[in-house]
Amino acid sequence: MISLSIGQGEIGATPLHLANLAATIANRGFYYIPHMVKETPDSLLNNKYREKHFTMVEPRFFNDIIDGMHLAVNAAPGSGGTAARAAVKGLDICGKTGTAQNPHGKDHSVFICFAPKDNPQIAVAAYIENAGFGGTWAAPIASLLVEKYLTDTTSRAAMEKEVISWNLLGNVPVKKR
């Protein structure tokens, strides 16, 4: 039971589960049923996907979690924030890094986030297999997605170039552009 509290042992969560968790935290306890839609007029979206579902946790208890997630990304350099590489000036990203142990090789890099802190518009989960620490790999990738979604551009050209240059497929051949 103790190992479950730190995400180890017999626990399974897909990236969609993790993104929905980030959205639930961002919404202070409510969520929508996740669904995939390629294209539809808004009026045709099934009502069950518009219905708010609530956790049994009171909304006020989410504030401390959100503050901690905000500090993980936006804390002053050297203060221990594990997701500093996800910080984007003016976006108030809140996030949580994770490193999923892998008994068969290098650990997996995990990061969930949402933004902006006080008016959430997007939640993202990045899960990069065999990549190592969440703050090193998954956080920068997720933050670029958040930034592009919220601003329709990216302001960190060096970070974007770095991420594009990574070979996260290990020994799988990658065709260079």
Outline where the language-model segments fall.
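Active-site beta-strand/loop architecture of penicillin-binding DD-peptidases
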Residues: 1-53, 60, 66-156
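Short, highly charged C-terminal tails/helix-capping segments
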Residues: 156-177
